[in-house]
Amino acid sequence: GTCLDSIEDFKQLIGDFPVDRGFYNLAFEGVASQVLFAMYIAAAEELGFSRSKLRGSAGADPIGSRLGFKVEVFPVEAELKLSADVLEFCVKNMPRWSAVGVGGFNCRGGGIDAVDEVGISLAAAIAYIEGGLERGLHVDECAPAISFFMASGIDFLEEVAKLRAARRMWARTL
């Protein structure tokens, strides 16, 4: 990992990279992901990059963090509100950014099976979209701002079937 405590740290980290031409996964967990995401945006803008052209994912999955890593910083309602804040901000200002990276792999690491991983991931994604809908956003605006990070175990055929089923279930849900 990398220790990032300030906007200056981010500027030093990304200073030589064309951050507007790649996809950057900011793999931070819990509430820290939103704070570090804001620092990343500020650093990129100070380096002359437009936030609307940045592409990547910010993690920001408090449900996955709670279930997979047992990280509970604030009450769940406050964490869901913060995730909805990030989702709304990204929909309005950063259309190429995945506001919430639903971490099914976090839960899988906690001991659940592939079926439960899909169920928990879809339920979490629905909760995040509902947060956007409560703010007046449309599902077609929210859905592209949600990404999924799923585990891949040793049973190859089961994992392929899981991913195919998850895609179909997500499409039907939307």
PLM regions and their residue ranges:
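Active-site loop/helix belt of alpha/beta enzymes
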Residues: 163-167
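Catalytic alpha/beta active-site cores
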Residues: 1-158
